[in-house]
Amino acid sequence: MNGWFQDLVTSASKPIFELVRSTVMGTPQIDAPEMARARSLWGTSQTIANTCYVLLITLGGMLLMTGQSLPGSELTPGQLAARLVGAFLASNLSLVLIGYAIVFANGLATAFLVSGENKIDPKVLADRVARHISTLMSPDYAFATLLALAVVVLALCLGFIYIIRIAITMVLIAAAPIALMFHALPLTDGIARLWWRGITGVLAIQVAQSLVLATAYELLFSKNPDQDGGSVLGLPSRIALLDLLLAIALLWVMIRVPSWVARTVWQPAQP
């Protein structure tokens, strides 16, 4: 039974950590081939949003005529005009703004990893962890094999979170023109604000994960891995269980980052 788990960990660790090393710490640029479908959907949403501005102007006129008889309708003609212009510009320039935001988030995430004395290459680090897991497994130590399996499962969850994050990013890109047009009226402004929190949140996830990885590398990982028997984690005791537990802790914190960010996205929208 222990041999079966070892074969499972060995066969699964390489492709899973290959996924993690190549994807998890970044977001594809807005002009990348992966974002072609998102750009196409953004163009469709832009057409719909620009068409709906006629309806928004009509609703704004109705709010002006009702005066202050409706909640959130305290609006002057000047404020309505400023809101309409701002919403129109935000809707039609949203793709450019998102592109700059992605570049900024990628650059900030990279800065956390490459700044300081020890530069961290997530690709090299993932390869080392995958090799380290294989060397830590012992035919006579089933518990270490189960811990190694837990590391592989958590790494798979981290890759799955990346896929979900990119999917949500593409949805937010596609919905940007329609969501931002709701800045035009006070009654619908909350929808546009929710979009801003959403796009900020999905980009903040990779930055926070990079910060966690950089901090963990400085505190837990060996600065001279070649001097401690090839160990990745920087504890000279060579305790395999402790190495695996530290890897599990690191991956668990990185997996929890999206849920912490999600709270900040949704909480302001709650009554």
Can you annotate each of these PLM segments?
Residues 50-57, 163-167:
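Selective recognition of hydrophobic, aromatic-rich stretches within alpha-helical transmembrane segments
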Residues 56, 60, 80, 84, ...:
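Alpha-helical transmembrane spans of integral membrane proteins, capturing the lipid-embedded, hydrophobic core
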Residues 2-12, 86-107, 197-211:
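Hydrophobic alpha-helical membrane-insertion segments
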Residues 38-41, 73-89, 188-203, 233-238:
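Membrane-interface segments at loop-to-transmembrane junctions
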Residues 52-88, 175-189:
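Hydrophobic transmembrane alpha-helix segments characteristic of membrane transport
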Residues 45, 87-171, 175, 214-263, ...:
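Non-cytosolic segments of integral membrane proteins
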Residues 176, 180-182, 187-202, 206-207, ...:
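Extended serine/threonine-enriched, polar tracts that run as long, contiguous segments within proteins
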Residues 1-52:
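Binding/recognition "hotspot" determinant
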